[in-house]
């Protein structure tokens, strides 16, 4: 009966870290920290640009992050020419991020202030960039507190910030001297593009409801809840998705139901 059919969604933010890694075909154990950082940064970018009362806190964090990246470049680059070239590359990338996400005048002014100290004469910056970074008005304590905040399993974040978060983490790693990080994560980033752009993943990207947590999702989609003693038969038509997406879908739903049952007491 067509009237009993509803569109199936599996919101991406309900995936745990290991499920993301499986979907992105991460082949190395050391790629796990990279993607964990991407998710954390994505959550913070979502907070920065959603325009609530916390945006000042997260903008301060973004400034702190940029300053640290530039500080690492200055510490590791051997010549002023190399330092300034790399620093201006970071500034250009950050400007692109801001223009893509939000016309934030505070961040734009911040980047312009740094860029004005990137002049070079006969291969010498005369310490202008270092002086500029040391004088920036950044609340260090607040930034460290923001940095310690963690994306909790099931918390909502906007997938549109994932690519931005990847860019920032890559910039951080390159500033620290990890010149092969893009090569190391190329498969993951290709799979991320697949998630962001492929119609096969639309059921993960464009859920009609923002669920508070896994239990909220299970109740709405499958009728699984403490107040419901019935056991409905749910059939998911997965004929239009690829085998890798089907494998992910099966794994995530099975894990959520198992975790839900594990939390129950007695005969529940």
PLM regions and their residue ranges:
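AAA+/P-loop NTPase substrate/partner-engagement loops
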Residues: 1-3
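P-loop NTPase motor domains
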Residues: 5-268
